[in-house]
């Protein structure tokens, strides 16, 4: 869930005295508390060692692997009522130079569940185009422009209200804009990388793959909500 500033030590607390797992997020709130608005916020980079010391978090809510018309309808009914959705895609890894593949999984995270659409198994182009074009739903995804570019090779759409948390962080002076760095800095937890290069085109996705995919989309939504709560969206224009 998005962090509550009330649970973070006050600005007068010594940063050096905090537990290492709290330092990234505490730095953000302590600095923010000393300035009016976010223009004075100073963000620092986070090291691999600091990330390794953070608690691991994975998505623990409902995940629906959409395969049937009934599951599709359930997913779209939930997505249509959402204000902010996390979004990500997964692609089969290529290990040969010059070889590439198109996305084979699209993940949409709402406040209630994460929905996984297997693009190689069923044609979800109409549903995903509806979602991506919906002007009332903010789509939050790290490096989402790359995901959309690849999806357009599968079907046509005109995406609206697209936001990249990495771009928001960059506009506030942060150079580390990958999902795992952002989750560590702003949300205070570590997302494992384990299944990033697994076979997303496999006949069946295993539980670890499903959790990995759901976690990425969920974290993208959590980052947007965190930035919104912290007032970091003021200078960001939705696409």
Q: What is the meaning of each model-derived region?
A:
Residues 29, 36-85, 165, 218, ...:
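N-terminal accessory regions of nucleic-acid-interacting proteins
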Residues 63-67, 80-84, 96-193, 197-212, ...:
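Conserved DEDDh/DEDDy metal-dependent 3′-5′ exonuclease domain
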Residues 1, 8, 38-41:
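Short hydrophobic transmembrane-like helices used for membrane targeting/insertion
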Residues 24:
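Cationic, low-complexity basic patches in intrinsically disordered or flexible, solvent-exposed regions
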Residues 6, 20, 32-36:
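Short, positively charged low-complexity motifs
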